[in-house]
Swiss-Prot record:
The gene is rpsU. Disulfide bonds: none annotated. Belongs to the bacterial ribosomal protein bS21 family. This is Small ribosomal subunit protein bS21. Gene3D superfamilies: Ribosomal protein S8. InterPro entries: Ribosomal_bS21, Ribosomal_bS21_sf. One of its GO terms (biological process) is translation. GO terms for cellular component: ribonucleoprotein complex; ribosome. GO terms for molecular function: structural constituent of ribosome. It comes from the Bacteria.
């Protein structure tokens, strides 16, 4: 769970910025987007295979 304690003399904007940064680092927003709608296991497998294929093509282009 992400939490931020506001320091003495710290503005709300700075505290909010730190909170957003911690949420992004923890991957909370991406997890929420991923769980927003149910995704069938077959669709997950297809997406995973497509992502692997893209990574392989990217590596080939770089020359690794």
């Amino acid at each position: 769970m992400t939490g931020v304690r506001v320091k003495d003399g710290e503005s709300f904007e700075n505290a909010m910025k730190r909170f957003k940064k911690q949420c992004e680092k923890a991957g909370i927003l991406s997890e929420i987007r991923k769980r927003e709608h149910y995704e069938k296991p077959s669709v997950k497998r297809k997406k995973k295979a497509l992502a692997a294929k893209k990574r392989a093509l990217k590596k080939m282009r770089k020359g690794f």
